[in-house]
Amino acid sequence: MGRSPCCEKAHTNKGAWTKEEDQRLVDYIRNHGEGCWRSLPKSAGLLRCGKSCRLRWINYLRPDLKRGNFTDDEDQIIIKLHSLLGNKWSLIAGRLPGRTDNEIKNYWNTHIKRKLLSHGIDPQTHRQINESKTVSSQVVVPIQNDAVEYSFSNLAVKPKTENSSDNGASTSGTTTDEDLRQNGECYYSDNSGHIKLNLDLTLGFGSWSGRIVGVGSSADSKPWCDPVMEARLSLL
């Protein structure tokens, strides 16, 4: 269940308070204290809401309230507390005896704000306006995902010098085409008798791909790559 209203709104006065209502409220609180604001209007003979009586007393009728304009010292205290607490007017009012939170808020919006702006200070950040614009205009530039290419070409593979008969390898002392095919290597040969390897490796930051391509100088030399190795590279 929701909280019941503090009064019957159909039988309460609204609008500006009259001098008679102010005096009746002051006399009752002086004699009986504040007490319960929900029952105070009926006890004081006022056709007002309890909340209206409380705000009227706190913001206007309290005897310890300060009257008149804010002093320069109060301005400095408000500015300093606002830089630390922000728009927490109740906490700021607790450091300024005799001033209400509503009064300080209105004074901030109508006077201090304009005063700070005239001096080139941002009332929200309490910094110079040019400095605030510089900080807010800084943009973090992400690293571009441009591919970085590394190319290795014309790499010569020296002939084997050790004889090997394992796994059906040639025993002639040199690396044969069949050996390279079994090892899954991509190659081409030229007229000099050397077996050359050409690698064109492309790397990227977001995703990378590698490909090994053989380019021959003669019409007979053709690039070849093991299908298993090619399938593995395509998955990367």
UniProtKB/Swiss-Prot annotation:
Induction context: By ethylene, asbscisic acid (ABA), auxin (IAA), and Pseudomonas syringae pv. phaseolica.
SMART domains (UniProt xref): SANT
Cellular component terms (Gene Ontology): nucleus
UniProt subcellular location: Nucleus
Key words of the record: DNA-binding, Nucleus, Repeat, Repressor, Transcription, Transcription regulation
Record Gene3D superfamilies: Homeodomain-like (1.10.10.60)
Presence of keyword DNA-binding: yes
Organ and tissue specificity: Expressed in roots, stems, flower buds, and siliques.
Stretches the record annotates as Disordered: 159-181
Bias (Polar residues) ranges: 162-175
Pfam families: Myb_DNA-binding (PF00249)
Main localization category: nucleus
Domain HTH myb-type: 9-61, 62-116
Annotated DNA-binding residue span(s): 37-61, 89-112
Molecular functions (GO terms): DNA-binding transcription factor activity; transcription cis-regulatory region binding
Alphabetical list of InterPro entries matching this protein: Homeodomain-like_sf, Myb_dom, Myb_TF_plants, SANT/Myb
Subunit: Interacts with BHLH012/MYC1 and BHLH042/TT8.
Protein name stated in the entry: Transcription repressor MYB6
